[in-house]
Amino acid sequence: MSILKEAYLYFANGLFFKAQSFGSDGTFVGEVVFNTSMSGYQEVITDPSYSGQFIVFSMPEIGIVGVNNQDSESPRAACTGVILSSYNDFVSNFRSEQSLSTYLKEHNIMGICGVDTRNLIKMLTTQGAMMMIASTQITQESELKASLSRTPPIQDINFIKEVSTKTSYVHTDSTFDFTHFAYGTSPNFKAKVVAIDFGAKRNILNELVAVGLEVEVIPHSFSAAEILSRFKAGEIQGVFLSNGPGDPLVLHNEIEQIKQLIQSDIPIFGICLGHQLLSIAHGFPTYKLKFGHHGSNHPIKNLQSGAVEITAQNHNYCVPESIAQIATITHRNLFDNTIEGVRYKDKPIFSVQHHPEASPGPREARILFEEFAKLCCK
């Protein structure tokens, strides 16, 4: 059983209260957002897009299925901390390898419980996502306030260097086979693509492999000239721009390289941050949502088929309506009508804001990976 310690929380709006800590000790600062997923907390916590953030889970009890060695979206926990109503340290799942508390401590992630998360989420929907500080060491409100005031705004921080791969590698895993409880492989590749890693989720790369694409993952500090040279030589047939954390507007070097890519005829598919970077590279800067979209139960409408799809989402930024000048809007969010997908006119480029890889969300949006594979095989 985890020994709970006292934790003190201070928010940018002045809210201060005491809770309990079941994760790593220390003082942690980050932006607080909320996630409405009913399951899949391990995938959420290990999603690199949550770098620099505290995640408030709307699900009232978390922890009973523990943590296993297969479901992580990246090699380590990515968020700053998690905030729960109730943490259950009694693990009851045949795949579990360790408790959530043990996992968080190993990865230096704060775990906070004993919080009225319903009220906290209502505050965030009213006032918006904000910065907060939490500590098991500092107990005084004035000290926490002073420490938080010295923290730079999250929109000024570049998290990509921390979560991107340092060296190129070939990703070989395909989607998870529940009959054998193992990741499969794809022996028949139709084309080869480079996946630019801004904090790519494992299951997104798995989906690319599953549709017959050989996937070479490369660092965020890529060279557009090198990619285009390989494309012209027939070595690769497409580019994938991954998801990732933070404000896309701070990624100046990456945007400049993408500007070169979009001047060519190389097929490009972007998800989440990749979707936003394509918009900026085309001259349409993103804007920040009040409290973002975080969860595996967000409905969107496919404007091409008329179908409603339930999607997994994790983003605080959105592309502007003016993108319609150069792209066809393909998907819209049914919660707030924001843009969820675009297809650029007269170019083999398309992108979506949501996460179509369906882990832990549903499978309806997987056709997007098949569309990308078809573009690369032309």
Curated annotation (Swiss-Prot):
The active site is at C272, H355, E357. The keyword Lipoprotein does not apply. Its EC number is 6.3.5.5. It holds the Pfam family CPSase_sm_chain. Small subunit of the glutamine-dependent carbamoyl phosphate synthetase (CPSase). CPSase catalyzes the formation of carbamoyl phosphate from the ammonia moiety of glutamine, carbonate, and phosphate donated by ATP, constituting the first step of 2 biosynthetic pathways, one leading to arginine and/or urea and the other to pyrimidine nucleotides. The small subunit (glutamine amidotransferase) binds and cleaves glutamine to supply the large subunit with the substrate ammonia. Belongs to the CarA family. This is Carbamoyl phosphate synthase small chain. It comes from Helicobacter hepaticus (strain ATCC 51449 / 3B1). The gene is carA.
